[in-house]
Amino acid sequence: MQDVKTYLSTAPVLATLWFGFLAGLLIEINRFFPDALIFPFFQF
């Protein structure tokens, strides 16, 4: 079990999870605010 924890905490695994999450977040932002260079809720 300790070996599995060590494997899952290595940098490539964490980087893959982080970049996958970030890509999904950017895709969802672009779905709701397409082609937004400045987001509508920041305009005054």
Curated annotation (Swiss-Prot):
One of its GO terms (cellular component) is chloroplast thylakoid membrane. It is a single-pass membrane protein. It is found in: Plastid, Chloroplast thylakoid membrane. Keywords: Chloroplast, Membrane, Photosynthesis, Photosystem I, Plastid, Thylakoid, Transmembrane, Transmembrane helix. GO terms for biological process: photosynthesis. The keyword Transmembrane applies. The chain crosses the membrane at residues 7-27. Gene3D superfamilies: Single helix bin. The keyword Phosphoprotein does not apply. It comes from the Eukaryota. Belongs to the PsaJ family. May help in the organization of the PsaE and PsaF subunits. This is Photosystem I reaction center subunit IX. It comes from Angiopteris evecta (Mule's foot fern).
